[in-house]
């Protein structure tokens, strides 16, 4: 293992759930305003995951008051306090940039149906 890899391994988070593009997430973000600190929740669909290791990022898209909002978060950053999976999406692409042009029902992602154990 290289020296940089061993340094990076120390700062990797272990509490990150397994999620993919198409999944709907609630990202709890730590916001600092002056000397106060609060948690803000950003809920939307994951449109991409990029990079690897410490530098891995993911982008979440939501529509707020008719305007599309996208935020890119570093996966292992301390400003992301918690990631919750709301629902699993069924998509065939790794990058869902095409959602930017779609409106209304067309921009909806199908929910993945899990098989029931018998």
Curated annotation (Swiss-Prot):
Q: Which BP terms from GO are recorded?
A: translation
Q: Does the keyword Ribonucleoprotein apply?
A: yes
This protein's UniProt keywords: Ribonucleoprotein, Ribosomal protein
Q: What GO molecular function terms would the record report? A: structural constituent of ribosome
**Keyword Ribosomal protein on this protein?**
yes
GO cellular component terms listed in the entry, alphabetical order: cytosolic large ribosomal subunit
By sequence similarity, the record places it as follows: Belongs to the bacterial ribosomal protein bL19 family.
Q: What does this protein do?
A: This protein is located at the 30S-50S ribosomal subunit interface and may play a role in the structure and function of the aminoacyl-tRNA binding site.
Record's protein name: Large ribosomal subunit protein bL19
> Organism source for this protein?
Frankia casuarinae (strain DSM 45818 / CECT 9043 / HFP020203 / CcI3)
